[in-house]
Curated annotation (Swiss-Prot):
One of its GO terms (molecular function) is DNA binding. It holds the Pfam family ROK. SUPFAM superfamilies: Actin-like ATPase domain (SSF53067), Winged helix' DNA-binding domain (SSF46785). This is Xylose repressor. It comes from Bacillus spizizenii (strain ATCC 23059 / NRRL B-14472 / W23) (Bacillus subtilis subsp. spizizenii). Transcriptional repressor of xylose-utilizing enzymes. Keywords: Carbohydrate metabolism, DNA-binding, Repressor, Transcription, Transcription regulation, Xylose metabolism. GO terms for biological process: D-xylose metabolic process. The gene is xylR.
Length: 384
């Protein structure tokens, strides 16, 4: 075996060992050898390398099953820190996490204007806020992940955001030049799907759909544990599938799009009158007070969500659909309405093969997904 091949094998072994340490900390070298099939000298050598790289450390002795007590190893989650940011239509939410995704700091801004220039200024301030308060660590800031609700191409350039009207914006290069760390740009629903897969309700599923229901509707698709992005990176824009061929005009240029009937924007519109402007918080409060008009609107909201979700279930046949929406998460009647509509329409052979679940990470799902993408890239670079 030549030197290049030996180096490659060592790196593959390091990756395998770190994966097991991440999943099973604390763990002994002997157990690592047993679980990976690598011999004890290889395990010892590669663990020493990981320790020199500050990714693994010893925490003392574990229980013995006979003979000497083993020295236990754990992953060093404080070796570096990651920033994940969710840029919505009218907000920016950011988090600083350690390498296991534990949130160390968070910050939220309401956007009075969603122009790219104003948004960039707030992003820079937020990132500076996290960096100046970040704990000391061997690797410092390992990267920044930012998601937006819109079309992201294969080069991570923002092509179009229907509800903010951003077009052809290279946010990745702009942030990378400012902070000189790896930067990742992703669609918001894809980021949310990844967050739920790594940390949340979809942890134990291989095939899931994540539906982000806010001003618009975005869908994140995970197939066999991998994000599905499509040929151009534009998959998941199912908020713009037609459910009424002769319906009203949408901002995307189509007519009768699903999100015109089943988004937060549509819900607010259905309750507003010339005399009364209704806020999202008003809807939550009125629903808790059992206001009849509000409850009827929420029932209708669930009805239209159920129609679109039925199409998605029949198309993808996932194990679960994770629903991210504050009202769905706080009002069981909306989820019940969705489930009722779906069960009455879905392909009968699907039976009970799927689950409809509220998000377990809530508003943090997209930012956690972005932080996870940054962390995975960092660990690949360090090890490979």
């Amino acid at each position: 075996m030549d030197i290049a091949d030996q180096t490659f094998v060592k790196k593959v072994n390091q990756k395998l060992l770190l994966k097991e340490i991440l999943k099973n900390s604390p763990i002994s070298r002997a157990k690592l050898s047993e679980m990976t099939g690598l011999n004890k000298s290889t395990v010892s050598s590669q663990v020493n390398t990981l320790m020199k790289e500050n990714l693994v450390f010893e925490i003392g002795q574990g229980q013995s099953s006979g003979g000497r007590r083993p020295v236990m190893l754990v992953f060093n989650k404080k070796a570096g820190y990651s920033i994940g940011i969710d840029v919505g239509v009218d907000y920016i939410s950011g988090i600083l996490t350690d390498l296991e995704g534990t949130i160390i700091l968070d910050q939220h801004h309401h956007l009075e204007s969603n122009s790219p220039e104003i948004t960039k200024d707030i992003l820079i301030d937020m990132i500076h806020h996290f960096i100046t308060r970040m704990p000391q660590s061997p690797y410092g800031l390992i990267g920044i992940g930012i998601c937006v609700p819109g079309l992201i191409d294969k080069n991570q350039k923002i092509v179009f955001t229907p509800n903010s009207n951003w077009r052809d914006i290279d946010l990745k290069s702009f942030i990378q030049e400012k902070f000189n760390v790896p930067v990742f740009i992703e669609n918001e629903a894809n980021a949310g799907a990844y967050g739920e897969k790594v940390f949340g309700a979809a942890k134990n599923h291989n095939n899931i759909i994540y539906a982000s229901i806010s001003t618009g509707i975005g869908i994140g698709v995970i197939i066999n544990n991998h994000l599905y992005r499509g040929v151009s990176g534009f998959s998941g824009e199912m908020g713009h599938m037609t459910i009424d061929f002769n319906g009203p005009k949408c901002s995307c240029g189509n007519r009768g799009c699903w999100e015109l009937y089943a988004s937060e924007k549509a819900l607010l519109k259905s309750l507003q009158t010339k005399e009364k402007k209704v806020s999202y918080q008003d809807i939550i409060d009125l629903a808790h007070l059992n206001d009849i008009g509000t409850l009827n609107a929420l029932q209708n909201f669930g009805f239209y969500l159920g129609i679109g979700l039925t199409n998605i279930l029949n198309t993808f046949n996932p194990q679960a659909i994770i629903l991210r929406n504050s009202i769905i998460e706080s009002h069981p009647m909306v989820l019940n309405s969705i489930r009722s509509e779906v069960s009455s329409r879905v392909y009968p052979q699907l039976g009970n093969s799927y689950e409809l679940l509220p998000s377990s990470l809530g508003k943090n799902a997209p930012a956690l997904g972005m932080s996870s993408i940054v962390i995975e890239h960092f660990l690949d670079i360090v090890k490979m």
